[in-house]
Every structure is written in structure tokens, then in C-alpha cells.
Amino acid sequence: SYFVEWIPNNVKTAVCDIPPRGLKMSATFIGNSTAIQELFKRISEQFTAMFRRKAFLHWYTGEGMDEMEFTEAESNMNDLVSEYQQYQDATAEDEGEFDEEEAEGEGQEYA
């Protein structure tokens, strides 16, 4: 699994007091969101199109890489996208359950 249980939040920001020369401030943002899967899908589609044509493959195999390494990398990328999709689907289901609970709670009368 590519996801770890010990990360409680999905966003981290930091501001550096010592900025690069010529700038007043430096900041870093790291976000772990299922939205990244769209980028992975696009890269995977581009890779697959080039790999099917064996574009540039000779440069890598000539240096000792095996074609199977590319197939394995493609499979790993597809697995990663699938896992992000599962987390996205699970989150959407959880939100749906929360909305249902909220709607049920609104129908109750309190004395």
C-alpha cells in the first residue's frame, strides 16, 4: 500500500524566515489529495502511447535496462492510480453517510 496510517492531516505548509536572494519570503506547500490521480493518469496515458511505439526505448535498453522494467513501472503507476481512486470513492461514500445522518438528526424533535 502506498498510503500510510500515521499521517493525520493531508496538508502541510511551512514558511522559511530566510528567503532566497531577492525575495521577501519563501514558502512550501505539500498536499496529499486524491486529485493527484488525474496527473498520474495523464502521465500514464502518455507513457503508454510512447511505450507501445517503443519510442526512445532503444536508448534505455542500450544502457542495460530491460523492457520488462518499463512494463513493471507502468503496472505500478496503474496500481497507484487505482488506490487513489479507492480512497476517493471511500471518502465520497463516507460523506454520503454523514449527510444521511445529518438529515436524520434534523428530523428529530427535542423537548
Curated annotation (Swiss-Prot):
One biological process term in Gene Ontology: microtubule-based process
Major localisation: cytoplasm
Required cofactor names: Mg(2+)
InterPro entries, per the entry: Beta_tubulin, Tub_FtsZ_C, Tubulin/FtsZ-like_C, Tubulin/FtsZ_2-layer-sand-dom, Tubulin_C
Protein transport listed as a keyword: no
Location relative to the cell: Cytoplasm, Cytoskeleton
GO molecular function, one term: GTP binding
Assigned GO CC terms: cytoplasm; microtubule
Pfam families the record matches: Tubulin_C
Compositional bias (Acidic residues): 91-111
Keyword Nucleotide-binding: yes
Superkingdom per UniProt: Eukaryota
Quaternary context: Dimer of alpha and beta chains. A typical microtubule is a hollow water-filled tube with an outer diameter of 25 nm and an inner diameter of 15 nM. Alpha-beta heterodimers associate head-to-tail to form protofilaments running lengthwise along the microtubule wall with the beta-tubulin subunit facing the microtubule plus end conferring a structural polarity. Microtubules usually have 13 protofilaments but different protofilament numbers can be found in some organisms and specialized cells.
Protein's UniProt name: Tubulin beta chain
Organism expressing this protein natively: Lymnaea stagnalis (Great pond snail)
